[in-house]
C-alpha cells in the first residue's frame, strides 16, 4: 500500500461529525475499512491511487440525497463511483472525502417498448441491461470497451464501436434524476422525443464527471435489436497507413 496516498488524518475539519451521521443513516453500509477505501481510491487510469476517507453504499435516491446533505453541511468532498473502469482519473479522491458507491442502485425500473426507452438506476451495467430487455426485441446500443455502469457512462459521455451507427450517450439519454451537492433532487428532460421546455439541463449533466450532481436515475433510448451482427478486422502496416 506504500504507493497509495492516504489523506488521513482527514484535512476536512467536519469529517468525523459527518461520518458519525453517515453511520447513523447507513449502518454497515458506511465504511472506513482500508481495503474498501483502497478499492475505491483508484480507476483504470495512470494516475496514482489515493485513499478516500470513507465509502458509502446508498440503495435509493433518498439515501443519496441524505448523504449529500450531510457532506454539504460539513464541507466534505463527494465522489460518485460506479464500476471504476474510467481511464480519466475523475474517480480518484485527491482531497479525500467520501466515495459514494452506486452499485447497489442497479435496478431496471421501467421498460416502454412502444416508446423505445427504459428507466434505469445508475449502478446497472450495460450488459446486464441488455440481458434484461432482450425479450422485448430492443437493445441499448452504446458499447464502451469496459462493462461500465449506465450512470458512469452518462457521467463520462461514453461512446464505443456502435457510436458511428447509433450515437454516443449524449444521444441516448432522454432524462435524468439528479441529486445536487446540497441534497436537492431535480429531474431533467422528459420521455418526449422533442421538447423546448426550458434549459437543456440533461446535456449539462451528461459528461460532467459527477462535478455538477449525482445521477440517480436515467431514461435511455433503445433500438430494435439487429437481426444479424457481422464483425471484420482491418490490418495496416503502420500508423501512417
Language-model segment annotations:
Residues 1-72, 85-116:
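N-terminal flexible segment immediately upstream of the FAD-binding catalytic core
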Residues 80-84, 91, 102, 122, ...:
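Glycine-rich, histidine-containing beta strand-loop boundary motifs that form or position
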Residues 72-74, 81-83, 148, 172:
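Short, basic and Ser/Thr-rich N-terminal targeting/leader segments
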Residues 76-77, 139:
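Residue-level detector of anion-binding/catalytic polar loops
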Residues 107-111, 120-241:
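FAD-binding subdomain of flavoenzyme oxidoreductases
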Residues 35, 82-85, 145, 191:
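Short, ordered loop/turn segments at secondary-structure junctions
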Residues 32-33, 81, 129, 143:
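Residue-level detector of family-conserved "landmark" positions at structurally sensitive sites
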Amino acid at each position: 500500500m506504500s504507493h497509495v496516498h492516504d489523506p488521513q488524518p482527514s484535512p476536512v475539519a467536519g469529517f468525523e461529525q459527518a461520518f458519525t451521521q453517515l453511520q447513523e443513516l447507513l449502518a454497515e453500509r458506511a465504511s472506513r475499512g482500508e481495503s474498501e477505501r483502497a478499492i475505491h481510491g483508484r480507476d483504470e487510469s495512470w494516475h496514482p491511487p489515493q485513499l478516500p476517507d470513507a465509502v458509502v453504499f446508498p440503495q435509493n435516491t433518498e439515501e443519496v440525497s441524505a448523504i449529500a446533505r450531510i457532506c454539504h453541511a460539513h464541507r466534505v468532498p463527494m465522489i460518485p463511483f460506479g464500476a471504476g473502469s474510467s481511464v480519466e482519473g475523475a474517480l480518484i479522491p485527491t482531497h479525500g472525502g467520501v466515495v459514494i458507491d452506486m452499485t447497489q442502485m442497479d435496478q431496471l425500473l421501467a421498460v416502454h417498448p412502444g416508446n423505445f426507452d427504459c428507466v434505469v438506476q445508475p449502478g446497472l451495467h450495460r450488459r446486464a441491461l441488455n440481458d434484461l430487455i432482450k425479450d422485448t426485441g430492443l437493445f441499448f446500443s452504446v458499447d464502451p470497451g469496459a462493462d461500465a455502469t449506465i450512470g458512469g457512462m452518462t457521467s463520462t459521455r461514453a461512446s464505443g464501436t456502435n457510436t458511428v451507427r447509433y450515437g454516443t450517450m449524449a444521444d441516448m439519454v432522454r432524462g435524468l434524476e439528479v441529486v445536487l451537492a446540497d441534497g436537492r433532487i431535480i429531474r431533467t428532460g422528459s420521455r418526449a422525443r422533442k421538447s423546448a421546455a426550458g434549459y437543456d439541463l440533461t446535456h449539462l449533466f451528461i459528461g460532467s464527471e459527477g462535478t455538477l450532481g449525482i445521477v440517480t436515475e436515467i431514461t435511455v433510448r433503445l433500438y430494435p435489436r439487429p437481426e444479424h451482427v457481422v464483425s471484420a478486422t482491418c490490418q495496416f502496416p503502420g500508423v501512417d497507413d
